[in-house]
Amino acid sequence: MAYVRLFDNPEGTQEQYDAASERLGVTAETMPEGGVLHVAGPSPTGGWRVVEVWESEDAARKFDEETLLPLLQSVGVERPEAQTWPVHNLVVR
């Protein structure tokens, strides 16, 4: 079952996001295994927001443990807690 994660980082900045993204090197062609969708931008309440859709919770957890968390630590960003929920419907053009 597909799985959504929403990260709201009140102290997050575009510069931090761009630094982490550059090191990850993820594009539509290199999306991590199990990744479906990744969207990021400024939060309406300030800071930075990221929304991800994964094929499963296990795929997201594997990416976190093996790739994302070590990278965020290396650029000095603490990963905020995620709001998560199962996907009922996903429409992509």
Language model features with spans:
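Short S/T/G/P-rich N-terminal loop/turn motif that feeds into the first structured element of a domain
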Residues: M1-E66, P70, G76-R93
